[in-house]
From Swiss-Prot:
Keywords: Cytokine, Disulfide bond, Glycoprotein, Secreted, Signal. The lineage of its organism: Eukaryota, Metazoa, Chordata, Craniata, Vertebrata. Residues 1-29 form the signal peptide. The gene is IL15. This is Interleukin-15. GO terms for biological process: cell maturation; extrathymic T cell selection; immune response; interleukin-15-mediated signaling pathway; lymph node development; macrophage differentiation; natural killer cell differentiation; natural killer cell proliferation. The keyword S-adenosyl-L-methionine does not apply.
Length: 162
């Protein structure tokens, strides 16, 4: 399963271990460098999460082309910047419809990973309350292709403001 911290995808703990073993820092200071390096490798890096969400959305788009899912999803096509968190929560809820409609394991894995990444990035925004925003059920129902395009657009809004 591909669900993992996106920050650990490119971080290699072996580099820290090699540095420690091949250097003359086999002292208390060297051990501190190694321990702090390992700790920093495991810290969440939310600035990369939205890029990973877009990657997963593109992957879902490609996977859905190979199967037929005839569903319409509540889609926010014109997101007001003051309602982007509310809209994102609606998009994440609607992704579960695709999970329910699809029996494809790759789609299930990718959507589950995307939901985890997006929720962890949303949690970094704190408990922001938005008022005057549409409820999910008030949104227009659109095809999966249009839904995914709108989803990418709102994720880009999060990237541009971070």
């Amino acid at each position: 399963m591909r669900i993992s911290k996106p920050s650990l995808r490119s971080t290699s703990i072996q580099c820290y271990l090699c540095f420690l073993l091949n250097s003359h820092l086999i002292t208390e200071a060297g051990i501190h460098v190694f321990v702090w390096g390992c700790i920093s490798a495991g810290l969440p890096k939310t600035e990369a999460s939205w890029h990973d969400v877009i990657y997963d959305l593109k992957r879902i788009e490609n996977l859905i082309q190979s199967i037929h899912i005839d569903a319409t999803l509540y889609t926010e096509s014109d997101v007001h910047p003051n309602c982007k968190i509310t809209a994102m929560k609606c998009f994440l809820l609607e992704l579960r419809v695709i999970l329910h409609e699809s029996r494809n394991e790759d789609i299930h894995e990718t959507i589950t990973n995307l939901i985890i990444l997006a929720n962890s990035s949303l949690n970094s925004n704190g408990n922001v309350t938005e008022s005057g925003c549409k409820e999910c059920e008030e949104l227009e129902e659109k095809s999966i292709a249009e839904f995914l395009q709108s989803f990418v657009h709102i994720v880009q809004m999060f990237i541009n403001t971070s």
